[in-house]
Amino acid sequence: MAQMYKIRTKNKNVYLRVAKGHFATMHSHTNYYIDVTTQKNRLSEAKAVAEELVHHYRSNTVIDTILCIDGTEVIGACMASALTRDDYINMNAHQTIYVMSPEYIGGGQMMFRDNLVPMLAGKHVLLLAASVTTGKSALAAIDAINYYGGKVVGVSAIFATVKECDGHPVHSIFNPNDLGDYESYKPHRCPKCKAGEKIEALINSYGLSML
């Protein structure tokens, strides 16, 4: 695997750490590994990411709940804090926001226990993900929100290759244009595999495992 390098923005705490190579996810093969570990787990970076994302919802979106997938709970808490500050026009009648994450059962299906359902049912829900590429995880979360009676008001991510998911707008800080030659393929259509290039690592929302 090539050495990791950073793609920076004007904000020193908002960046992507990436490496080029041949990587496999559950749903696709890609030529980039995007590491957002520090953004998800370090407070200064999480706050910076949150500030970049919340301006999309500053004054025109009711948000009762932020549903976090891919381990984005710290960012979600920072977004909730920012959206309920006095300098924001908060359209939430209760002036507070729930921050939650799903429980996973067989096949990657998401569920919520009875004590958590009131945080979704009848609520305006923002979905927060580390990345939205194939969109399958985001779609599963949207299906779960709908099943439990919530209303999806948008999707936010650090990195996304799509601008909408199931008809909902996707707002991200980074997209494939920031990488230049980003590619993602279904496993059976991967040109690197067809060329005999070995997969270097398995990647998912938890990180990377070298092969």
Residue ranges of model-derived segments:
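Active-site-facing substrate-recognition patch
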Residues: M1-V62, S205-L211
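PRPP-dependent phosphoribosyltransferase catalytic core
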Residues: A2-K10, A140-L211
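Short, well-ordered alpha-helices that flank and scaffold nucleotide-derived cofactor binding pockets
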Residues: H55, S81, R85, D143, ...
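Short amphipathic alpha-helix with an adjacent loop that forms part of the alpha/beta core around
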Residues: R58-S59, D114-M119, P187
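Short glycine-rich phosphate-binding loop at a beta-alpha junction
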Residues: T61-T72
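Short, well-ordered alpha-helical microsegments
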Residues: E73-A77, G135, K163
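Short, glycine/charge-rich flexible loops or terminal/linker lids adjacent to PRPP-binding catalytic cores
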Residues: E73-L126
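A contiguous pocket-lining binding segment that forms or flanks enzyme active sites
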Residues: M111-A157
